[in-house]
Curated annotation (Swiss-Prot):
HAMAP family assigned to the protein according to its UniProt record, in alphabetical order: ATP_synth_epsil_bac
An annotated GO cellular component: chloroplast thylakoid membrane
NCBIfam families associated with the record: ATP_synt_epsi (TIGR01216)
Membrane topology per record: Peripheral membrane protein
Organism: Oenothera elata subsp. hookeri (Hooker's evening primrose)
Protein name in the entry: ATP synthase epsilon chain, chloroplastic
Amino acid sequence: MTLNLCVLTPNRIVWDSEVKEIILSTNSGQIGVLPNHAPIATAVDIGILRIRQNGQWLTMALMGGFARIGNNEITILVNDAEKGSDIDPQEAQETLGLAEANFRKAEGKRQTIEANLALRRARTRVEAINVIS
């Protein structure tokens, strides 16, 4: 038995395929979803989506949004998403370094919050590349 997973951003469909299992980062922690999972709607945190398909684990960096799970259908609507395999490791590391520098020199509450958000996004992209499947 499989799950139909659809990952959408405002601009494109990132993933639309059958999968065996997912592990999703939500605002209240990670949840694993297998076929016949109880229906749920949840907020999606900035984090890694792990996808098991054809005996392999794949990763995707998600940048926050919402998920709806029910009847073996998973729809995830996020602000942005990138498959781990599509992320350039060198560019991701450079972005992380820049985000860390910006966080260190942030002044004021607003700058600190924005820098922290950029840092979380950069770390998530690097993690999506480095997750051992």
